Design a protein with these regions (language model features):
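Feature captures hydrophobic
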Residues: 1-154
Length: 154
């Protein structure tokens, strides 16, 4: 798989540049997703800013036939938004493979903490559609879901 980052100078923060560079080095993180999957990564300073939708930075990832494309800004008609705290991103970019990344991501969802890191999801498509696109498999690897039926509780 190939990971491509576009327009890195358009990111508002150095953290987003580091995160997109990290994701481009490990495109296998997205190997469970079908080609055409398109979603946003939004970085937030705090839970309060997340609650009122004030992102520190935002970019989108598109899964194509060869790998991923990462671009600044929101996806057009994205599948979901993955909201992440600054602390979570700083820790995630230290991981070395898909499984470690997924498990740490899952811990931020299952045990959110304002100081140590948190993530949340905003789904923009039907849950069954997201399962069919491979998001369920990734969530299982992350420990967010025990099986596909658990996605309905997100």
């Amino acid at each position: 798989m190939v990971g491509l980052v576009f327009d890195q100078k358009r990111y508002k923060t150095e953290l987003a540049r580091k995160y997109t560079t990290f994701l481009s080095k490990y495109p296998e993180i997205f190997s469970d997703l079908v080609s055409g999957s398109h979603f946003d990564f939004a970085i937030y300073k705090s839970i309060e800013e997340y609650d009122v939708h004030i992102q520190l930075d935002i970019f989108n990832v598109y899964r194509n036939g060869q790998g991923i494309e990462i671009k600044p800004g929101r996806a057009t008609n994205g599948d979901l938004e993955l909201a992440l705290s600054v602390d979570a991103v700083e820790k995630l970019i230290q991981t070395k493979n898909k499984v470690d990344y997924a498990q740490l991501l899952g811990s931020f969802y299952n045990e959110p903490d304002e100081k140590n890191g948190w993530i949340d999801f905003m789904l923009h498509k039907r849950t069954q559609t997201l399962i069919d696109m491979g998001y369920g498999r990734f969530a299982q690897t992350a420990g967010i879901l025990e099986d596909d039926d658990d996605i309905y509780s997100i």
